Amino acid sequence: MYLAIIFIVIAGLFILSAVLYRVLNSPKAKGRRGERTVAKILGETVPGRQYIINDLMFTEKNGNSRQIDHILILPSGIWVVETKNYSGRIYGNEQQREWTQVQAFGRRKNKFYNPVKQNTTHIYSLSDYLHTDRAIFQNVVVFLAQADISYIQSNAVYTAR
């Protein structure tokens, strides 16, 4: 009888830990952690007068919704920041539709939509929504430190360290 109870408790703990591991390591959870990290860095390192809006959601006239990770409002302009919490080597340039993430010593490759283009869409939408000239917006993509972006060809992409 006691063995059955012990077995059930151990099995329950094993299942609970497996579920927690999957939830905490889901792409959505990793993305949120990355966004929080970049928000903290922006708040601590940008000098002078600034306003930071994190996780802005708005709906366009056509009904499409947009989510922007960070907007940094400075006297020099409005910086629209897209955060990527990826690991491994990242390959791509501003003109390509898709970029490639390479992990596990080249054994695993994932394609993802070019974040510079993604953020350009955010800027167009925000500019239209605010009836503002696009020239005041700066496009910035930030990968967290575990990503190797040395293979990216873009002046808009940075690493948060």
Where are these regions (language model features)?
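Acidic/histidine-enriched active-site and ligand-binding environments that engage anionic O-linkages
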Residues: Y91-N93
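Surface-exposed interaction regions that form or flank ligand-binding interfaces
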Residues: M1-R66, I73-I78, K84-R89, E98, ...
